[in-house]
């Protein structure tokens, strides 16, 4: 898997394992997280501006404590636009989504950002075949949860890391000693399943909530979640 979990796990596993094989179905956009130790000045800034930051979280569409630019992508010349992309790439984290106001709402604006990200990833990954597989995106930037990473794409420059494109070479079978694809067999000691999880509805379903007429929430949501305004469920305790 190469969603947010796999993207975090792969670089760390690659440092310890003699050999790592990553099986990718869907390539994901990712921006460097730029994690670092919180400085004394930053801590003081947050404490001194806590209420303002809290208000900002409530005001922004994505619920994060950073402002989304009021500028539209094509309101500025290309050279200046590229400079802005570079600036936000260096900042890292989720802020890249806020570099321009229309990235998530305008297809051409999104294409501009996507092309930049594809270029940056291709610059990082030295193996051209891997770079092509990792940037063969089937969705606009931000339309799936965009992960952030620490040295994820750099990981594919290591000699002990191998990438398998399971769209071209699908997994057929997993047995006791490894994974069989349509064209190859990969003998493995350990398999890490980073294939996703039921993040939103899973917790509620596992509570075994029962409503009117002994109807179980799991059965009620059998064909997908149904709510009132995303807050209440008809016929169940709310």
Language-model-derived ranges and their functions:
Residues 2, 17-238:
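N-terminal FAD-binding dinucleotide-binding subdomain shared by FAD-dependent oxidases/monooxygenases
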Residues 9-13:
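Aromatic pocket-lining residues of Rossmann-like dinucleotide-binding sites
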Residues 5:
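Hydrophobic/small residue at the entry helix of a nucleotide-binding pocket
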């Amino acid at each position: 898997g190469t969603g947010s979990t796999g993207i975090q796990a792969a670089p760390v596993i690659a440092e310890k394992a003699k050999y790592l094989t990553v099986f990718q179905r869907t390539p994901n956009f990712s921006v460097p997280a730029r994690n670092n130790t919180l400085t004394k000045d930053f801590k003081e800034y947050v404490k001194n501006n806590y209420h303002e930051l809290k208000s900002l979280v409530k005001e922004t569409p994505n619920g994060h404590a950073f402002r989304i630019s009021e500028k539209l992508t094509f309101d500025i010349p290309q050279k200046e636009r590229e400079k802005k992309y570079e600036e936000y790439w260096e900042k890292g984290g989720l802020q890249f989504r806020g570099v321009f106001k229309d990235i998530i709402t305008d297809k051409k604006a999104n294409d501009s950002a996507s092309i930049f990200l594809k270029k940056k990833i291709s610059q990082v990954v030295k193996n051209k075949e891997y770079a092509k597989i990792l940037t063969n995106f089937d969705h606009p930037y931000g339309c799936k949860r965009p992960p952030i990473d620490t040295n994820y794409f750099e990981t594919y420059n290591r000699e002990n890391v191998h990438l398998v494109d399971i769209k071209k070479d699908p997994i057929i079978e997993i047995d006791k000693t490894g994974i069989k694809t349509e064209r190859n067999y990969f003998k493995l000691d350990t398999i890490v399943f980073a294939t996703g999880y039921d993040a939103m509805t899973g917790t509620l379903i596992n509570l075994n909530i029962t409503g009117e007429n002994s109807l179980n929430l799991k059965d009620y949501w059998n064909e997908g979640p149904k709510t009132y305004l995303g807050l209440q469920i008809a016929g169940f305790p709310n």
